[in-house]
Amino acid sequence: MLTLGDYNTLRIVKSVDFGLYLDGGEEGEILLPQRYVTNDMHIGDEIEVFIYLDQEERPVATTEHPIAKVGEFAWLEVAWVNQYGAFLKWGLMKDLFCPFREQKMCMEQGHSYIVYIKVDEDSYRLMATAKIDRYLSLPTKEEEDTLRHGTQVEILVWQKTDLGFKAIINNRYQGLLYENQIFQPIHSGDRLTAYIDHVRQDGKIDLTLQPSGRQHTLDFAEVLLRYLYENDGHCNLGDKSPAELIYDRFQVSKKAYKKAIGDLYRRRLITIGDDGISLVK
């Protein structure tokens, strides 16, 4: 069965001057335009293609990769706007339509927005919606077992709030990065690796950008030790240095830096002074 707005593996059944026809099952033959045909494609081969709708709303294949597919969230820029809605750049020749009824605010050309990509049930057209809350779910009790403290996840930064930044976790859940846990510049639309800090009773998820636990401390301690060996045995950042300076140099939080210093100090590998830390001679 052909899946619109997603990748499909289809067999080549016919070659014509303007491309290749692929077996689309119940949908009939699907055109792969000549611009995407390569010399290693032959009749009978199965190839992976992305299926979307052309200007006449017919299924068409491409070997290009869109920024996101149906069922995913993405940060997309508005290419142009008309009396029906906005058209978003998503990496394919035909822009993705977001009608006015699916916009939380009037989208403007050149601005970017978080949207969810779906197939419209009434028209069977690919569509974006900025009303994304309805597509975010709360984890079930069983799913919470896979979202334990320290679990690595992929996030899409959503929007700034008074507390920090909302984020979309693994294309499914809503999370929050607290302002006092952010030690690097981040912006709406950034895709980042993050870690589960806590699943609250209301199902909302607190996030951190720093891995936690003893192993992370040991891993960074070795990085810091190597830095000292490569820099004449000294680092001018101590446990009282500003968090921003620590992050700029090592991309870790001040808390992680202090833990690593403490570990190296307990192992009698460094001394701690007013001017930073130094290797024991």
How should these model regions be labeled?
Residues M1-K281:
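Single-stranded RNA-binding regions, centering on S1/OB-family and related RNA-binding modules
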